[in-house]
């Protein structure tokens, strides 16, 4: 238990440093969210730009003269209370945006991770057991090639092929607006259908990397003495493959699974923007584009918290499932 | 000034846990001396503290209490430079020659680098000295090995190489931790022989940590001392041949009794002495009594309460036992 | 002696890579691209004059990869663009590996409060998501005219942390190795222990990471061009792709298939070469590394 | 371990399903029960639906004063007094039945059958309140000195003396003036709005008259307006009322991040003619996304810029897709930063005008656009013949693509070509950066072509992309050498004044720092374009005088090249005919010219006049 | 006594990056029922290869080139995998050398027992399983309650070794093969295991084959000893004969180099040189570079496997054509 307390304190320190770093970074970002509005006002009303800017600042509730330190103290203070700040662009609290967007992102990444993990584990173990055979070469070559495709290219291709060319998938959104959200089969079906694109874009590269890691791990575990001992005991291949090889090869991956989910929170910007999917990444991209610093810091903090929680959970899960760690 | 290493009242406690509450006494009040040209064997099973003792002697670990003197100077009180100077005189050979040799360096480099560092030589002299050293420990022809890597050698060859490396600083004492346990039976004698030769021919004091009583006997039957450790304490100490032929402590007896005998007839007829327990005792600061009490077949109530002192039962033979101490 | 050690080096590090199928193919691919970047522009001329009427020509002898939306030869652009792609990618990977190694080794060797502090720094860079951070950095540095080296450094800042973490773990285990202890016993100086004993075993590891970084650096550099941080280079593959996908909409027209295909092919092939090489390197060197643990 | 792993996976599955369910429920901003249960007027059931693409703020607040307003729903929701068709110059009455313009006074007679979508009648009180609201919130338009409501259906606007003559047009056609703040929705704010607006006006008039403004008045105003603004900004009718009562033809009923659903206003005055009772907006996230939506019939109409080949492909993939183009009343230009010494040299700008092949640039960038073949006179190509006399044209330099001419100009001015590179008279190479806003596809394509042509001529030009969200800032701060930007543009009011104002006393001059107040040599003597613009504004009603000034401005613009226009932007409008809706007017119909600056007006007009009908 | 396993001309190799390791090169051996056979050799001499090839459990890079292993008249090497699986463990159980890593680290000990039982279609209830497992664990002097619910890493090296033996005994096999059962164990534990095996042999009707590099262990336990050198069988004789009258020079060297506790230390004589690399084994007799009796023919011709009087088999040119060892 001491270990976890220790670890928690350490992660807390890391968190504070990271968040402060993010804050400094965002606050040094050039650009003024009120600029566009000011240009518009100045042009429409034929007034001096400086004056228009002042009006725009007031309209958006931005105080450009507030010192960075004050802002920082305010921000940290809010964060302590679980308040992620205020979005000037959306004119609402970041918490509300997170409440709207996070479930979708979590939905996509957890489903994508689940799918890619299960298939990747299976394929990796399968390939490793057929090491050197054609099927192994095929699987690992394919996985490597998929890994070589930059994710945004993959996302664009998926969108084009499935939504545009063959019109199999709906374009954009999380569900059709003319449906009432409910637990009905048809609604859940629509939600799943809308999520297929983003899920594929996340899951395919993931799957490739799980496959390759699992293949490597399996190959390593297969060399272990206890595998040969299991063979010597006359255990069936299927039992060895599942209980002995797969379980042991999977352990390190299960830990990285949790961490992976944390990291994916931050990596959704491109995919969600391409698929127009209303998750965290979508808002993140928007926040950068419109220089919504409040939203930006808020989402950044969320992602950092996500990664840290994931790291912590990974430690915990790993200790839970691996007796070698548990007993130490 | 013939004393090279003196260990005075050395204890070692390993602590762990967040508040360092869990602890384990690994060594307790050890006193030892090594003088020029000595042979010393530390025997005992694993977990008895022999490796820790050897590492403390070689200053690879700090004792929790007590003094370690090299050439009469407390190594934890002298300055770094002096310690460095003295360190060359005390060398250590690890148990596992696979791990103690750099896997990606050639044999030439493994010897020549420290040689150049210690002797401040280079060029042809370095080459010649490296060659001499390799030949000295029996890797002949030396040039054949120069561009080989450790994994090209057998276990015995590797251990020789590790010994050769220890010799680069012209040490006055070599401490070797289980130098033969990772080596094939047929090559073990040769390594022990090498240590004996180093001792005989160059006057280097040798401290061997062994669990193999036979090897201990081979090393000390001409001269040298044996120290038997149990539960972090010296239970018996004395001239090698004397102890092996007339063991006083019950543990020493069991140890000798359990050692393999290379004679089928004798082996089949011998009766193994069984202990009451084969567990390794875990001693804490609160532990009382003789560490062997829980396993000893001769224990008395006294053994549970009082730590037996190390008493001399004969010239050059000390034992720490309430029962056999007299 | 020297000749011998060269030979040894060849047999220990080069020859196994040539024997391993994966690393051999990877090496061939990478060599091909490096040649393309170095020698290519000298051989292949670049004519960027647009010719709208000649756009989307199918691959032919005259235009091996066809022409793009502007009617410019795609092959020429790929060849000339490889220079900026490869220089930025390689530099960024190099810096990432350099920073990662130095910090990782330092962390591995330093105990106590300094070590924990370095640990925390590594962790900080691990928990800040790199891509969004880079987006912001891109905006922050937008008005500085950064040169390739500076941009590579900027990219490397977000790549080194995982490597540093791995290296520090490696060093932590290596420094308690018995051969390191032996070097200490032999009074070997710290620099010898760090740069000869420890670094020697990290080299294959670092190399693998270097190759792995190529992928990350490649993606980042393309992203940076999109964002306008890196100096705009119309033949940079990332920009070509941007033109193809977003400006010219080549995906949406049957004529433009080859346009996108050849750009993606080259990007994927380059990264795939790196992946193959690193897989090969891992296969060749890791057993030995593992065997010594 | 096995069982633990299974548990772990089970937890995992549960977590993602709950996440999904959470995501499903409580996602969208939708009216509360109260709104849906309201008794509906008896209406014939209509089933027409049209799908469009646009943008809107999300979470949707329904407050036009809040950030983002109501997005693309604007013209469906807020009707102006009238629509103005630029091509015919005709005003189509909407909320106004008729109006009378007198000296500094506009009297508007409101339509008597206009009702809000919740059944409340639309009266002159709503207009008064709206004007107070805008003035209080936006500190604009102070052109309106006061507004009165003599009866429920008459509004009298008293304009200030300084009000420009084009303001009447704005007043009549601007969607903001009539119905933004219905009294029954904003009832808690009415008095406060009037108080703040009056105070603001008072200060403004004191300032324009050059009189001192008492400090306490200023502070009072600051305090009151801040308080008011904060209150209004926080007000989200769509959320708090659960509905958005609108006077326009459609009312938003359900809004998500990616889609917005609007239902017809049953009480709308044209309701009986409308055959379409539902509008679905898709989020316009990127042009490619809109292309994809058009191909797959996800939307019925949109106006993205699209390369030629994509259009061809689209038409083959979707034969129901039609395209037409209208002038976007704006042009894309090469603009210079006159703070950089390089561009102060007119010779260089002239040479550039000769080097560029503007037809080629147009082909690459927006192929449907109108090309400026010869001139750079600051008047849109499509309007040139209307505003520039033959006589004037004779006087203008023709900038046809002619590199030899360019070379000659440069050589005469002391430039030298050394190797492949042109050098300035001071020995420096002609080198600069061309900045272009990254997210605008057509601009980037144009920039690439410009850079390419200039480089092959022997200049050293590099291109730089301005990241998303940074355009105004970069351009305003003058942190560029040359750039691609809107040049002279008409925007809402199709008169050369708008364009010249932009060039010499507005946005473009703000970013280029073109010395507009300097005097320039013309056949009419030494003239300053800045003065000319002011003069033109004063003489707008006097057509002859205006024409004369316009000739002079055209001359200066063409000869002194504050910007080089590349092509006249057009709005390509794509619509699916016969998939969901049909009845689109012919491509020549002047109604399309209403599209620039608010294409939803066209859709609204087509629906409310019953022209667009659902496909059976 | 009848022959239970007959090995005929067994050849097995390992494929490695550098080439082919000829680990077992023409081994022929008869194992008698209910006897204890020791296979003695240095590390990498091919001794483990023999038993692994016999049971077809070579590591993935191992290949059996030729030979037959007849168990009760059936050739194990050509037997179908399914059939072989049934025989494995139920009739022939092999306890591998690496006892430390031979248990799945993520499974409790009890699950290993369960797996093994299930694999052989034995239908025991859970309580039956516990009972049987406990019985076998008690047989190797382990506390079943504690051990069964432990993870492997909670057990000491000696305990793991005993767990493996208990596991091997679970289905009452006919033949029990142990690979280095005592190496890497402490003296007392080693003696303990040897004692245990002796008792097992008395208690159960079982054929025991074990592999060791310590010929002293063979002396204690074995009825017959087979000596392997460099992948070749060099001598096969009864234990008593081997120790009394070693025929092959290597066997003789091996016995002379033992540092047993009862030995005359002045006669201990290490074998010079290093064991051969099986990648490029020496020509002719593989021992010739280290053999003090080496003749010209030894370099060229491989000695034949000849049977001398009694049970003695040897492969040495000294005995061919009736040349007696002097």
From Swiss-Prot, chain E:
Membrane-crossing residue ranges in chain numbering:
none
Cell compartment(s), UniProt: Cell membrane
Q: Name one Pfam family in it.
A: ABC_tran
GO MF, one annotated term: 4 iron, 4 sulfur cluster binding
Per its UniProt entry, what is the enzyme's top EC class, as one word? translocase
- Enzyme Commission number, as recorded: 7.4.2.9
Keyword tags:
4Fe-4S, ATP-binding, Cell membrane, Iron, Iron-sulfur, Membrane, Metal-binding, Nucleotide-binding, Peptide transport, Protein transport, Translocase, Transport
Q: Which GO terms describe its cellular component?
A: plasma membrane
Q: Can you give the residue ranges of the ABC transporter domain?
A: 5-255
- Which reaction equation describes what this protein catalyses? a dipeptide(out) + ATP + H2O = a dipeptide(in) + ADP + phosphate + H(+)
Listed under GO biological process in this entry are: peptide transport; protein transport
User: What does the record say about its membrane topology?
Assistant: Peripheral membrane protein
Q: Where does this protein hold [4Fe-4S] cluster?
A: 285, 291, 298, 316
Q: Please summarize the record's notes on activators and inhibitors of this protein.
A: The C-terminal iron-sulfur cluster may stabilize the structure of the C-terminal loops and may function in the regulation of the transport process.
User: Which residues make up the binding site for ATP?
Assistant: 44-49, 61, 97
The protein's matches in PANTHER family, at most eight in alphabetical order, are given as: MALTOSE ABC TRANSPORTER, ATP-BINDING PROTEIN, OLIGOPEPTIDE/DIPEPTIDE ABC TRANSPORTER, ATPASE SUBUNIT
Similarity comment: Belongs to the ABC transporter superfamily.
What domain notes does the record hold?
Contains an N-terminal conserved nucleotide-binding domain and a C-terminal domain bound with a [4Fe-4S] cluster. The C-terminal domain forms a stable loop region and interacts with the N-terminal domain.
Q: What does this protein do?
A: Part of the ABC transporter Dpp involved in dipeptide transport. Responsible for energy coupling to the transport system.
* Protein name (database record): Dipeptide transport ATP-binding protein DppD
